């Protein structure tokens, strides 16, 4: 840090220290920028994702307190493991009760599928081949999952662009119906 002295050179000495510190900070920022550019995540292409999924398994009913190391230890006899993932809930940040294992080659999947039903932390686990996710929540190859006319939330029923008919069962002209059990009340006036 800069020291303040009572000399006439104190301002020039102080400025030299600031320049030296700013040069050091600039070097650090340049190193970090290079590191961030090289480490930027690029999602795999569709073909690359299919190749990864062909070498991966889904593991269900995993204990919530399981660790990646424990899962890898349980599946180490199946083949060389590239990556193990336990997804977490976006909001609570707690891990979910399933995991994915990516193997080095696709022949390891058959060995892993044999582990289906085995006990892991006193729970029977479900092991299946990982499927490739189809983005779009049901829009795409699988078709729409929101009814015949592709209704989403808040969309009107019926064919798109068609006028909707609204049926009103009760009309209260002079206020609400104050009678009980279908009674007309004192103020009922249908016209």
Curated annotation (Swiss-Prot):
Pfam families: RRM_1 (PF00076). PROSITE patterns: RRM (PS50102). It comes from Caenorhabditis elegans. The keyword Cytoplasm does not apply. Transmembrane segments: none annotated. Residues 55-132 form the RRM domain. It comes from the Eukaryota. GO terms for cellular component: nucleus. This is Putative RNA-binding protein EEED8.4. Keywords: RNA-binding. InterPro entries: Nucleotide-bd_a/b_plait_sf, RBD_domain_sf, RRM_dom. GO terms for molecular function: poly(A) binding.
